[in-house]
Design a protein with these regions (language model features):
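Phosphate- and other anionic-substrate recognition elements at nucleic-acid/protein interfaces
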Residues: 1-154
Length: 154
């Protein structure tokens, strides 16, 4: 069974796991548009759809989103917009989708606390791909890989 894990958001990622093997991981595809004389990043829906279609995934797992303290309205709107794009693509491609709270997959996979914890755990589970989780900004990749691993274990 091939499972896609998605860390939703502009700094998120998409990972494909089959059994206990990480097949591939991609940063969330984005593009920049100008709005009110400011550059805004948005999810590139066409590229995301291509990646998901090519993955041949039989199911998808996404982290359940919730408001975070101190997060502004604009940030929450952007996150919701990204989630809508992801859910729309998965529905259009007829891929069964499950959302899971962060603590659920983190606890099931024994992920240490903090974003460094997910990078560390992903490198442990997928040592051949450890370099993809090496940088602090690779937390989206590690989260996506772990979410997919959680889904594959179900």
């Amino acid at each position: 069974m091939r499972v896609i894990g998605i860390d939703v958001g502009l700094n998120g990622a998409i990972a494909i796991v089959e059994g206990d093997q990480l097949i591939e991981v991609h940063d969330m595809p984005t593009f920049t548009v100008e709005r009110n004389a400011k550059n805004k990043r948005m999810v590139n829906a066409a590229e995301l759809a291509r990646l998901i279609r090519q993955s041949a995934a039989t199911s998808a797992y996404l982290e359940r989103l919730s408001a975070m303290p101190g997060q502004g309205v604009t940030s929450m709107f952007s996150m919701g917009q990204s989630l809508g794009v992801v859910l729309g693509i998965l529905a259009a491609l007829d891929i069964p989708t499950t959302t899971i709270p962060p603590r659920t997959w983190q606890k099931a996979l024994d992920v240490p606390q903090g974003k460094d914890g997910s990078r560390y755990r992903a490198a442990q589970l997928f040592p051949a791909h450890a370099a993809k989780f090496a940088r602090v900004k690779d937390d989206g990749r590690s989260d996506a890989a772990l979410i997919a691993a959680y889904g594959a274990s179900r």
